[in-house]
Amino acid sequence: MASRYQDVLAANPIAQALSPGFAPGQNFLRWRLLDPAAREIYVDWEDAVDAAVSGLRELAGTVPDDPRMQTLIAELSSASPHFRDTWARANVGYRLGVMHLRHPLVGDLYLCRNQLIVPHVPNAVGQHLLIYRAESGSDSARALEKLRSLSAPAG
């Protein structure tokens, strides 16, 4: 679950094991842009960033004069030429499709990405649930299962 600013509000254990960018409290766009580890995990890093920036642009439109959003956009524009260029292209909307990740423990994963928007309710405007899933029976599904077992608490 993420805010309109792409701050991670909650994540299940497998999401957290999949990427440090999904840790609660983390801004996953900032992490993708600025942490070198993101380039190792996202095989097509530019596509992963472009998808997140297009999603942010859509979410920014939900409250156009939001000072926190404007601060985030200014911060990312200053810190990342790639963000600045992608933002200037003005693509809007979360992109569905397959994302290729490379995890250091389980290898390559091809995950379908989806998004569910929380209906407009006070204090939740722009909150959304990100869903990454593997095709049933695929190598990616087996890799996710292995990751789940590796990240499960002992006991």
Predicted segments, located by residue:
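Hydrophobic protein-protein interaction segments
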Residues: 1-155
